[in-house]
């Protein structure tokens, strides 16, 4: 037996899911385009920081996606990388040089141009970080060497080693483009949404930090992803984010008609909202699945046999079937099934308690008097947060 002390353990780590939201309206109403008005969106948690590489945290990404554009767009159906702020691009044979042609006429909401120089500064920051401003390196950019502005609308990026994932990296939330004024701010100042100047379809109008955020549509927006059917400014006039931590309060507000969209619906609440005609949108990640991550400096799990034993001792199928719904499919790999390069690794992730026990025996962890595995006087007891 391995004991795990749960502090704030996310059981969803065993599932392949990005986030679940509920949309007001029926399936037929969803096809009708609403023009004008302000969408009321209830968010479970407040955003923490809007430095674009911090966009992997859902509340951060939800804001950044509305106020920033990306160099490229990944089609969610085909997974192809398509033009957005970049009209076109070329990559050399060993993927160490990328050249992008920038769409003309794009501006940030402060009126400054989103040109090659601005793109270069963004990726120099994301690829190298800025120690003076405490801005960290983006997790999706590796081997970055630097940039060169070829002309006002052409920028070239250089890498120390082949970086085949960079093109896809330019399409993710964490690569949102912001103005030079925003990039000049220290990391700690970027939690203030009113200071984030992007080129996206919405701009921040006001904020009550940690409680409420109001956005308004940018009337002159006309540079969305080139292949999308809708072009031009957003159909909505605005979006109002309201931080509402309690699950029951969010659902109650939705059912009472006080909200249009709520994020984070627990599996046990899904039937309730669906029975009222609401639409559940459960988008899976197109990158890395939710995972349990071990600290490599923890001596209890430094032996790979112990980590493998934990994997095979966990009945993920039973957990998903008991605690979740069909919207939480069991992960078949560290990479999502909708991501490029996915390979089904189910056989290597299988529940096998006999194998887990054998691995622990081989690693020297024997069963003690309490029924817990122990070694050198220490019990195999882990804390998970």
Predicted segments with their positions:
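Aromatic- and charge-enriched surface segment that lines or borders ligand/interaction sites
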Residues: 87-132, 150, 156-158, 300-302
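Extracellular/periplasmic solute-recognition and catalytic clefts
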Residues: 128-129, 136, 147, 205-216, ...
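Bacterial N-terminal signal peptides that target proteins for export
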Residues: 2-14
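Surface-exposed binding/hinge segments that line
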Residues: 31, 101, 136-184, 201-208
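Short, well-ordered beta-strand elements
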Residues: 35-45, 87, 97-100, 119-123, ...
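Gly/Pro-rich hinge or "lid" segments in bacterial periplasmic/extracellular proteins
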Residues: 75-76, 171-240, 248-249, 353-358
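Append "and occasionally in soluble cytosolic enzymes with long acidic Gly/Pro-rich linkers
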Residues: 219-222, 302-385
């Amino acid at each position: 037996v391995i004991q795990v002390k749960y502090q704030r353990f996310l059981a969803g780590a065993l599932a392949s899911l990005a986030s679940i939201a509920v949309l007001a309206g029926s399936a037929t109403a969803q096809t009708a385009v609403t023009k004008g008005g302000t969408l009321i969106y209830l968010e479970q948690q407040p955003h923490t920081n809007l430095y674009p590489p911090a966009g992997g945290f859902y509340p951060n990404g939800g804001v950044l996606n509305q106020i920033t554009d990306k160099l490229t767009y990944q089609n969610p159906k085909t997974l192809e990388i398509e033009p957005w702020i970049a009209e076109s691009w070329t990559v050399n044979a060993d993927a160490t040089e990328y050249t992008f042609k920038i769409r003309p006429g794009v501006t940030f909401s402060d009126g400054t141009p989103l040109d090659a120089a601005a793109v270069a500064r963004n990726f120099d920051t994301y690829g190298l970080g800025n120690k003076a401003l405490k801005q960290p390196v983006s997790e999706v950019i590796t081997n970055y060497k630097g940039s060169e502005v070829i002309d006002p609308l052409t920028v070239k990026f250089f890498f120390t080693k082949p970086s085949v994932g960079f093109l896809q990296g330019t399409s993710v939330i964490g690569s949102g483009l912001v103005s030079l004024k925003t990039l000049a701010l220290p990391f700690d100042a970027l939690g203030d949404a009113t200071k984030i100047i992007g080129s996206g379809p919405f701009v921040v109008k006001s904020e009550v930090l940690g409680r409420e955020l109001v956005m308004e549509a940018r009337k002159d927006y006309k540079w969305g992803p080139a292949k999308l059917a809708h072009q031009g400014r957003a159909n909505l006039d605005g979006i109002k984010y309201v931080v509402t931590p309690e699950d029951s309060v969010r659902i109650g507000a939705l059912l009472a008609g006080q909200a249009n969209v709520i994020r984070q619906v627990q599996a046990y609440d899904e039937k309730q909202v669906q029975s009222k005609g609401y639409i559940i949108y459960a988008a899976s990640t197109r990158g890395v699945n939710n995972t349990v991550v071990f600290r490599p400096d923890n001596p209890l799990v430094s032996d790979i046999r112990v980590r493998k034993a934990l994997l095979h001792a966990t009945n993920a199928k039973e957990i998903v079937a008991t605690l979740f719904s069909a919207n939480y499919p069991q992960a078949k790999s560290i990479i999502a099934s909708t991501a490029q390069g996915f390979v089904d690794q189910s056989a290597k992730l299988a529940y096998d308690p006999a194998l887990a026990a054998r691995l622990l025996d081989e690693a020297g962890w024997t069963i003690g008097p309490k029924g817990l595995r122990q070694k050198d006087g220490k019990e195999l007891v882990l804390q998970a947060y």
